[in-house]
Design a protein with these regions (language model features):
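Well-ordered beta-sheet/strand-loop patches within structured domains
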Residues: 3-7, 11, 17-363
């Protein structure tokens, strides 16, 4: 059910605890605070006229002035390419230093849309628990990046490949409980029907797939473990209703791309062995042994010494440590949907509604 603040607000007013009540609603995270400050900055930009739309032939001075609205470190003396590279990194683009089509598109997103993105991401922070496990794995689906936290501090990150807009990776939280070394791939029926069965049995056999009977009398496709398995050499399992997981991949080309939303929904990892080693480091019998286990070519499940929390999140706006805002595209249109819900909710707010639930004031 949607959170209804009116009962607790009425109680806070009656008990003269309004400041404490308001403070309790704010997510206790630097990520949220960075967005809150960013929102104020972008609202100020909007209130002073926003920014003009740039053309591909815009002069260097016009481009520099546009960049300076979001990046206060832009100066008139530094090369324009350096300022463009900073902007491209903030937008998750290839930092060529050129005003290419993707950069132009990002710069021409309206300030109102940037504000809507910030507000949508602030709302997602409100969905988070009040405390996060200090040791955890976080995947930013929109940015296709995995970050490992230990002691509540980021210790390593790697590129990932997340779900395409038509095969979306879900937002969820769970716990990684085990790693499958040299996993076979039990091909989901949706993929088998659309992509594999149409190739014909002979082609599938040549490509190393096996067709096996199901208990119900049907057929399914299995790709045996090995260097060419779609799951690579490692699969990280966690309970969830979407049948998604983290895994290795033999197809490494996408990791050098800045457009990495290309999977069927699971998350492919750039450095799976490094991630596995971090997860088993506290077990002397497993620490440093992941590659040796892979080299046996045997399929085996390794239970983790302790389960590791995993969060699949969708951040399209976030602040750097210096307060500069970063943005990513909204490939699933989740920002757009959430912005519509936020706007609809704000229209439904009745500023007098609290009076209907508040107790009579005491003398």
């Amino acid at each position: 059910a949607a959170f209804d603040p009116r009962p607790s607000l009425a109680k806070a007013i009656a008990e003269d605890r309004l400041p404490q009540w308001a403070a309790s609603l704010t997510p206790p995270y630097s990520g949220y605070d960075g967005l809150r400050k960013g929102l104020a900055t972008y609202e100020k930009i909007r209130d002073t006229g926003g920014w003009p739309s740039l053309s591909a032939g815009a002069s260097a001075d016009v481009v520099r002035a546009r960049l300076a609205l979001e990046d206060k470190s832009v100066t008139g003396t530094e090369p324009l390419t350096a300022a463009l590279q900073r902007a491209q990194r903030r937008y998750g683009l290839n930092p060529t230093g050129l005003l290419d089509a993707r950069t132009l598109t990002a710069l021409n997103v309206s300030v109102d849309d940037r504000i809507a993105a910030i507000m949508a991401n602030m709302e997602r922070w409100r969905w988070m628990p009040r405390e996060l496990p200090v040791n955890r794995v976080q995947v930013n689906i929109a940015a296709a990046v995995l970050t490992v936290f230990q002691g509540d501090e980021p210790v390593t990150s790697m590129r990932a490949v997340t779900g395409s807009p038509t095969n979306q990776t879900p937002m969820l939280s769970s716990n990684i409980h085990s790693i499958v070394v040299n996993p076979p791939w039990n091909v989901p029926m949706s993929i088998a029907r659309k992509e594999l069965f149409p190739k014909g049995r002979a082609t599938l056999a040549k490509q190393g797939y096996k067709i096996v009977k199901t208990p119900e009398g049907g057929e399914r496709i299995v790709q045996p473990a090995g260097p060419n398995s779609a799951l690579g050499r490692l699969k990280f399992d966690f309970n969830n209703p979407f049948a998604v997981y983290l895994h290795d991949t033999p197809s490494r080309g996408k990791f050098s791309s800045y457009d990495r939303l290309a999977s069927h929904g699971c998350i492919r990892l750039e450095k799976p062995v490094s991630l596995a080693e971090l997860m088993v480091a506290s077990d002397p019998s497993l620490s440093g042994q992941i590659q040796s286990l892979i080299d046996t070519n045997k399929t085996q499940r390794v239970s983790l010494p302790s389960q590791v929390a995993v969060y699949l999140l969708y951040w399209t706006a976030f602040a750097s440590s210096n307060g500069t805002m970063n943005f990513r595209a909204d490939p699933y249109d989740w920002d757009k949907l959430l912005a519509q819900k936020i706007e609809a909710s704000s229209r439904r707010v009745d500023p007098t509604a609290v009076n209907s639930t508040a107790p009579a004031a005491k003398d």
